[in-house]
């Protein structure tokens, strides 16, 4: 929980299960609030139609990061706010907490 700060954007690398590197994408989250046992976020809307191709490890991340920053400044987030509880080993929550990193 300590690594998450309210107001910062974090990314989480997510595979689509197709078995190719090109299918690995990044989800972006704005942390909106947090409690002792949970964090709340809004997901930044990122679509292949906007960027022309799926975001993957081989993509120009700096260029994409600027696009995310621009969109985040004008507030393009999904309306719904999500939360995740304290991680437990072996759960999806554990994976989220282990691999989510701040966008710098």
Task: List where the protein language model places each region.
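Short, solvent-exposed coil/turn segments at beta-strand boundaries
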Residues: 4-6, 33-36, 77-80
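Short beta-strand-centered aromatic/proline hotspots
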Residues: 25-34
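Short coil-to-beta transition motif at edge beta-strands of beta-rich domains
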Residues: 1-19
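Short, solvent-exposed secondary-structure boundary/capping segments
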Residues: 37-46
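Short, cysteine-centered beta-strand-loop-beta hairpins and adjacent loop/turn segments enriched
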Residues: 17-23, 48-55
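Intrinsically disordered, low-complexity, charged/polar segments
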Residues: 49-104
């Amino acid at each position: 929980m300590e690594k998450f700060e309210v107001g910062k954007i974090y990314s989480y690398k997510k595979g689509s299960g197709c078995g190719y590197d090109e299918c690995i994408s990044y989800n972006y989250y704005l942390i909106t609030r947090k409690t002792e046992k949970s964090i709340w976020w809004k997901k930044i809307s990122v679509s292949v139609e906007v960027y022309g191709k799926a975001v993957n490890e081989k993509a120009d991340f700096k260029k994409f990061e600027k696009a995310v920053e621009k969109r985040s400044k004008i507030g393009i987030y999904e309306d719904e706010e999500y939360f995740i509880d304290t991680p437990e080993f072996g759960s999806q929550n554990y994976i989220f907490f282990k691999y989510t990193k701040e966008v710098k």
